């Protein structure tokens, strides 16, 4: 079945056939910078690891789409053979653009669920209600962390929003972005409002441990995961007590979903399957199994398919069997730039200029090194590149203005990798979510193909809110 629904055109996307005609078949060295590059082989590998880990542990998985904002990568995140498509989005526009594919999934007999992952703003209700009518009852879930959210939704009639509206109660487990503490009166008030409403139903309990980005080892990431899981369990128990409901060990009863994760803690679960049966690993695995008997534990994450320098700095998970930690080979996203100027005698460090500043890369720091991006060894895959955990010798983006980026050589001057005006370079960005947002589309290559430099496809990113 082909859906007739199209997303509102206030932020129109670029014409895909024109982009494909322009780019497919070209080599990366012939592309005009700046450009956003994805490696499909790395994406497949990262997505497979996450799905394998959650399936092996017997927990659910919900893919966040905010990083990439593409249908193609959302499909990789959930897996081609899945029977359940569970997603979370940060903007209404993301859901609008996913709607045609979700309808296609429904026509194939797959169950679908998508959450609007920001506590409800009343102004979004008309667009969300329109989506709920298109997708069907119970598909679109709404975040709440205040009783007024429940009251606002309770005033929406069924002709506007069919069926009971699933709400996901957001528990604050220490990140202090959104959510309410598990022992708060505000959480109890949400529970009472839910009990009094005939229009909403409990979809699940949710937590996001964004401060897990500060971890520096697999063990530390697992510790954050355990804290997040137990905090979410406590919030769920407190909430259910106020609604006169309770968790159940009955295998035939429908369990309440507990959804937790950020990419570091979500990737940390791979360490539960690493084969190293340490006391701490066994304890975290036992906690997960215990809670999963009473609730339906679900992991959510978003940036893990593409990864970036912030994520490699967490060292939250190994890159594969026998590996100790994530490597640069696990980063699927790179930014193509061109050298605009060279300044070998400007200061103690050789410098160069690229036409790519904070508008291109963002201004978010990375704890493992003092810059905003690292120059990769592309295209020859030889020569020195800066490794925060190794030699710390190579080119980094050391300073950014709006459209200017200054490359700094770090390490001994005699080892400098010479740069020339007009030379094209690839950068690993600090934060893929921010750097990707500055582009209208990705150029997709595949390192498992005979020529890994050839553009195989163009994936257009959704725009707007």
Please identify what each model-predicted range represents:
Residues 1-30, 104-106, 160-162, 242-249, ...:
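Eukaryotic N-terminal low-complexity, Ser/Thr- and Lys/Arg-rich leader segments
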Residues 24-36, 40-41, 46-57:
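N-terminal, Lys/Arg-enriched amphipathic/low-complexity engagement segments
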Residues 43, 66, 98, 169, ...:
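Conserved, mostly hydrophobic/aromatic
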Residues 50, 56, 78, 108-111, ...:
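Alpha-helix-loop-beta-strand connector modules within alpha/beta enzyme cores
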Residues 62-218:
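Active-site-proximal beta-alpha core segment in soluble small-molecule metabolic enzymes
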Residues 166, 172-323:
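Active-site loop/helix belt of alpha/beta enzymes
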Residues 268-270, 327-336:
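Short coil-to-beta-strand transition motifs
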Residues 344-465:
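C-terminal accessory subdomain/extension
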């Amino acid at each position: 079945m082909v859906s007739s629904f199209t997303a509102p055109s206030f932020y129109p996307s670029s014409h895909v056939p024109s982009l494909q005609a322009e780019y497919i078949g070209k080599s990366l060295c012939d592309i005009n910078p700046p450009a956003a590059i994805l490696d499909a082989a790395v994406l497949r590998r990262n997505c497979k690891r996450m799905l394998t880990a959650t399936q092996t542990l017997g927990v659910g998985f919900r893919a966040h789409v905010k990083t990439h904002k593409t249908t193609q990568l959302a499909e990789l995140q959930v897996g081609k053979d899945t029977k359940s498509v569970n997603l979370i989005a940060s903007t209404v526009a993301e859901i609008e653009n996913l709607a045609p594919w979700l309808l296609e999934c429904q026509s194939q007999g797959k169950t679908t669920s998508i959450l609007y992952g920001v506590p409800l703003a009343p102004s979004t209700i008309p667009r969300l209600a329109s989506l709920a009518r298109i997708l069907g009852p119970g598909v679109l879930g709404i975040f709440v962390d205040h009783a007024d959210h429940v009251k606002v939704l309770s005033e929406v009639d069924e002709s506007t929003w069919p069926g009971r509206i699933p709400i996901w109660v957001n528990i604050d487990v220490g990140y202090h972005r959104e959510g309410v503490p598990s022992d708060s009166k505000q959480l109890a008030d949400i529970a009472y409002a839910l009990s009094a409403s005939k229009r909403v139903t409990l979809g699940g309990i949710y937590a996001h441990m964004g401060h897990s980005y500060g971890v520096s080892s697999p063990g530390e990431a697992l510790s954050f995961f355990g804290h997040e899981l137990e905090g979410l369990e406590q919030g769920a128990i407190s909430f259910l007590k106020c609604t006169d409901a309770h968790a159940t060990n009955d295998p035939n009863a429908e369990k309440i979903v507990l959804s937790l994760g950020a990419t570091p803690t979500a990737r940390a679960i791979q360490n539960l399957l690493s084969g190293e049966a340490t006391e701490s690993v066994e304890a975290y695995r036992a906690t997960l199994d215990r809670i999963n008997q009473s609730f339906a534990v679900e992991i959510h994450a978003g940036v893990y398919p593409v990864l970036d320098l912030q994520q490699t700095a967490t060292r939250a998970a190994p890159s594969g069997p026998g590996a100790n930690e994530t490597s640069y080979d696990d980063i699927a996203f790179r930014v193509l730039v061109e050298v605009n100027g060279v300044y070998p005698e400007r200061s103690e460090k050789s410098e160069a200029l690229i036409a790519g500043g904070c508008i291109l890369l963002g201004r978010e720091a990375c704890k493992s090194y003092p810059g905003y991006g690292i120059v990769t060894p592309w295209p020859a895959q030889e020569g020195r590149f800066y490794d925060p955990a190794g030699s710390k010798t190579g080119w980094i983006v050391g300073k950014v203005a709006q459209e200017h980026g200054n490359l700094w050589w770090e390490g001994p001057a005699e080892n400098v990798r010479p740069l020339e005006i007009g030379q094209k370079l690839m950068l690993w960005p600090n934060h893929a979510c921010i750097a990707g947002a500055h582009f209208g589309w990705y150029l997709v290559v595949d390192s498992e193909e005979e020529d890994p430099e050839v553009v195989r496809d163009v994936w257009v990113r959704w725009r707007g809110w």
